[in-house]
Amino acid sequence: MRLKTALWVAAYLRRCQVEGAFAVVRRRGAEEAGAVFVRISRLDGTSDLFGPAPQSALDTSRGADRAFTASFAQQPASDAAVEAKLEREMKFDSDLWIV
């Protein structure tokens, strides 16, 4: 059984805080099963973006853990490219979360 997305995001934010990183929920999606995108701003006009891994890439030995994959082949990407990608994803899936 997979954790509800809202609980997973809350735990992820707490983990970031414990590690000394600043993290916020930029967009709140579906409480139960929304996809999660993690954006890491490098504060220099570039960002890394990670999204849900395709089902074919999931490791069944890890159970129901969430898996992520880089959204751009060349990381970091420009902030404009990351924003454009997120806008396209939001049009496709209105239930997604952005952290």
Predicted regions and their residues:
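Long, hydrophobic N-terminal alpha-helical segment
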Residues: 1-35
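Short, intrinsically disordered, mixed-charge
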Residues: 11-18, 43, 52-55, 88-91
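Helix-rich interaction surfaces within compact, conserved domain-sized segments
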Residues: 53, 60-99
